[in-house]
């Protein structure tokens, strides 16, 4: 086998439902059978219709895997699409039937489908101006949002001051940048944990809103010398949020009740995860992580639904690996090789525009994510980006510096930074596969690559992305 790029070694592969209750702010949804008519001729109908009543789409790398596209494709089969965590730091790029591009951050990707209700759960953090900006952008492009989005009354509010604090905190860390999006996500979750945050339901009590917001301002001013605060700023912000409160009111709902009633009524719910497991506050490469739980556990805590109701979970994984910002990346390709993947895959962040670091698919990290989440299947995305490479590598195991093989993905950052990756080398393929829609029509080398990933991860690949459009998807 050819020598591995970068560090490492290579070797060749050897309960009964109650009476119907209308969802708040939405016309009574058409039964699932009705929506099935539109996709009856779709060869993927059986694969999609077999998904559980409550299913989820979660990232299984460091984000940017292409979750939004799969959610967009699956959404017509579901009554509700729900976000359970994160905020505007999560970027989802989707395309409508005319090929128009939409870059969403907080609004769930199901918004392009008129029969789908979108829910932003209690585990998310809401920057109200940004939320309205997304809605205005959608509506200006002909996408109706009226009565189609519900925001949890328990979700926390993310203020501009959180974004200011985010930048000040990052500057304080000097050479130890976590690489945040500076969208205020971490400071907002910090306010939540220290119990001085404000929630969406506080917008219904403007008589006490100012006093609560004052505590946040004072706290930031006491903590950061660079944070300038005056009572005039507070007054302006309160007046601003009075206007926001009036506009947001039709969107506010007790989403815990809505979702659980919907489950009892046998409605289908698709959970759209933001970020990914390798950025999870508990399971990710801490401290280079996000501030919430983008893994399976975050579904329950971020929506208020029980673990027993969750069925199929689909892990989304790129055919290679990318990462934005700092943090360990064992299979990273530096220099020209990384540039080739970056340019071919147009690897620049949806939210930040930052160039993504690129490398080979890390099977050790993928298996770790599969263990944590219990994925029933995988969606392998951007397989087309690998076309034209003479050979493709899979990082199948890690060795420590002393040569001893690691038995699991290490939690210790120092250990992870020093691992030596063992690679399998597989043959590449020359042909452009972006127009292929049947698994059997893929080049033999591409099929072997997919099947080797299945073997190593122990989870079947049911969906294969071969381009950005919603139709550029192979069902296996």
Curated annotation (Swiss-Prot):
Binds 1 Mg(2+) ion per subunit. One of its GO terms (cellular component) is cytoplasm. Its EC number is 6.3.4.4. The keyword Metal-binding applies. Pathway: Purine metabolism; AMP biosynthesis via de novo pathway; AMP from IMP: step 1/2. Keywords: Chloroplast, GTP-binding, Ligase, Magnesium, Metal-binding, Nucleotide-binding, Plastid, Purine biosynthesis. Substrate binds at residues 350-356. Pfam families: Adenylsucc_synt. Signal peptide: none annotated. IMP binds at residues 64-67, 89-92, 181, 195, 275, 290, 354. Residues 1-34 are annotated as: Disordered. It is found in: Plastid, Chloroplast. GTP binds at residues 63-69, 91-93, 356, 382-384, 465-467. The active site is at 64 (proton acceptor), 92 (proton donor). One of its GO terms (molecular function) is adenylosuccinate synthase activity. Coiled coil: none annotated. GO terms for biological process: 'de novo' AMP biosynthetic process; IMP metabolic process. Mg(2+) binds at residues 64, 91. Belongs to the adenylosuccinate synthetase family. HAMAP family: Adenylosucc_synth. PANTHER family: ADENYLOSUCCINATE SYNTHETASE, ADENYLOSUCCINATE SYNTHETASE 1, CHLOROPLASTIC. Homodimer. This is Adenylosuccinate synthetase, chloroplastic. It comes from Triticum aestivum (Wheat). The lineage of its organism: Eukaryota, Viridiplantae, Streptophyta, Embryophyta, Tracheophyta.
